A protein has these predicted regions:
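Transmembrane alpha-helix signature in integral membrane proteins
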Residues: 1-19
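Hydrophobic alpha-helical segments of membrane proteins
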Residues: 3-4, 8, 46, 113-121, ...
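Short amphipathic alpha-helical coupling elements at transmembrane boundaries
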Residues: 26-36, 47, 76, 88-92, ...
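C-terminal transmembrane helix and the adjacent membrane-cytosol boundary/short C-terminal tail
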Residues: 64-65, 111, 117-118, 160-192
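Generic hydrophobic transmembrane alpha-helix motif, especially the helices
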Residues: 9, 22-69, 80
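Membrane-cytosol interface at the C-terminal ends of specific transmembrane alpha-helices
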Residues: 3, 49, 53-102, 112-120
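Hydrophobic alpha-helical transmembrane segments of polytopic membrane proteins
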Residues: 7, 44-49, 133, 145-181
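Transmembrane alpha-helix boundary and packing residues in multipass membrane permease domains
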Residues: 15, 45-49, 58, 62, ...
C-alpha cells in the first residue's frame, strides 16, 4: 500500500515539477535536496517520538520520506527527457504539455519508478522489522517478523527456528523485491 502511494504521488508531483526549464526554482530544489538527504529511518524516529509507535505512524513516516525521494527521481528524469530530441520534435509539432508528459516522457521513466518502488518496499520491510526488533514494535497485538526474531532470541538454543524462520522470511521478501527491481532495471528503456 505504501509503495503504491509513493509511486502514484511521486510520479504525479515529479512530472509536474520536472516539466519546463531545469533549475527554474533554485530554492525549491535546495529544499528538496535537503529533505531527501535525511534518511528514512530519521523520519521514522521523528514520527514515532511525536505521534507514538503504531502501524499508521510507521507507514506514514516511511511513505513521506520515500515520496520525497520519488519526486526527486521523477523530476530529474523528466528534466533529462525534456532535453532530448524526440521531445523537442513533439514540442515543435505542437503537442500539448499533457500529451508530451503522458505519451513521450512517462513511458521512459516508468521503469525507474517501478524499480524505485520495489527497492523502497524492501527498505520499508527492513526498517519496520528493525524497529520491531529493538522494541519499537507496531503496537500491541500486531505480530511482525522483527518482533518474532526479538522474542525468539531468549530460546534460540532450544528452538532456533523461532529466530531463523522469521529472519529467512525477511531475507526472502527483501531479496524478492530487490530481484524484481533489478529485473525491471535490466529491461531497458522505451524510446518513443
Amino acid at each position: 500500500m505504501g509503495s503504491a502511494i509513493v509511486m502514484t504521488v511521486g510520479i504525479l508531483l515529479g512530472l509536474l515539477l520536472g516539466q519546463g526549464k531545469a533549475g527554474r526554482n533554485v530554492l525549491f530544489e535546495s529544499i528538496l535536496n535537503a529533505v531527501t538527504a535525511i534518511p528514512p529511518i530519521a523520519y521514522l524516529i521523528i514520527f514515532i517520538s511525536t505521534w507514538g509507535n503504531s502501524v499508521s505512524t510507521m507507514v506514514v513516516a516511511l511513505t513521506v520520506s520515500l515520496i520525497l525521494r520519488m519526486i526527486k527521481l521523477v523530476k530529474t528524469k523528466t528534466e533529462l527527457e525534456y532535453s532530448k530530441a524526440y521531445v523537442l520534435c513533439a514540442v515543435a509539432s505542437g503537442a500539448s504539455r499533457f500529451r508530451i508528459l503522458l505519451v513521450h516522457i512517462l513511458p521512459n521513466l516508468i521503469r525507474d519508478a517501478f524499480r524505485f518502488s520495489c527497492l523502497s518496499a524492501g527498505e520499508m520491510i527492513l526498517s519496520i522489522s528493525g524497529f520491531s526488533f529493538i522494541g519499537l514494535s507496531l503496537g500491541e497485538g500486531v505480530i511482525d517478523w522483527g518482533s518474532m526474531v526479538s522474542e525468539g532470541r531468549t530460546s534460540f538454543g532450544l528452538a532456533p527456528g523461532l529466530v531463523l524462520y522469521p529472519m529467512l522470511f525477511i531475507f526472502l521478501c527483501v531479496l524478492s523485491f530487490n530481484l524484481l527491481g533489478r529485473q525491471l532495471e535490466a529491461g531497458g528503456r522505451i524510446d518513443a
